[in-house]
Amino acid sequence: MELNVKTLEGTDAGTVSLSDAIFGLEPRQDIIARMVRWQLAKKQQGTHKTKTRAEVSRTGAKMYKQKGTGRARHHSARAPQFRGGGKAHGPVVRSHEHDLPKKVRALALRHALSAKFKADELIIVDQLVAADAKTKAAVGVFEALGLKNALVIGGVELDVNFKLAAANIPNIDVLPVQGINVYDILRRGKLVLSKAAVEALEERFK
């Protein structure tokens, strides 16, 4: 497959050949969804915690005698039915991670890339280099490319000036190619790849 290459100024810079095995698949939403769930589960902190009846700070003595009061039988005021008592079956500190095979994760990334290509939301630029780290200049670059919401993927090493210039622009994320992931691809409108990123992806999946 051939796709036009743009410069950061928005002019044409030839074409690039894209691998069908990476950008030409028929996107499977089920595989992509599994990958997104896996990523979000890994991100979740899991620091939620409530105190059980064994952990609340309250006396453990029996509230009143067992018989003769006409009231319901109770032991400690730590029981879950009382205000200030422990929580029954509450959340505990735990990891929310679950397993997803490495081959499925790799396949999900290829399907996400293919989905962007199929939706005409993939842009290839020749290089991501800025003369200086000025946000105003970077805003002009993204306007020239028609980008308001995008994930920008560079090569293994990002140009420092370009990275700093784009850092404060809302809805624009810049990552090196080794940081590319399904969740970030889907949460942004356009996907911008440098030629170096395309080469690195094809090397990774060959």
Curated annotation (Swiss-Prot):
Region described as Disordered: spans on this chain: 63-96
Return the Pfam families for the record.
Answer: Ribosomal_L4
Where are its TM segments located? none
Composition bias of kind Basic residues appears in 64-77
A biological-process GO annotation? translation
Q: Name one GO molecular function term.
A: rRNA binding
* UniProt KW Cell inner membrane keyword: no
The alphabetical list of record keywords is: Ribonucleoprotein, Ribosomal protein, RNA-binding, rRNA-binding
Domain of life here? Bacteria
User: What are its GO cellular component terms?
Assistant: ribonucleoprotein complex; ribosome
Q: Does the keyword rRNA-binding apply?
A: yes
Recorded hits in NCBIfam families, A to Z, give:
rplD_bact (TIGR03953)
The UniProt family comment states: Belongs to the universal ribosomal protein uL4 family.
* Subunit-level organization: Part of the 50S ribosomal subunit.
Explain the purpose of this protein: One of the primary rRNA binding proteins, this protein initially binds near the 5'-end of the 23S rRNA. It is important during the early stages of 50S assembly. It makes multiple contacts with different domains of the 23S rRNA in the assembled 50S subunit and ribosome. Forms part of the polypeptide exit tunnel.
Q: What is this protein called?
A: Large ribosomal subunit protein uL4
**Organism, as annotated:** Allorhizobium ampelinum (strain ATCC BAA-846 / DSM 112012 / S4)
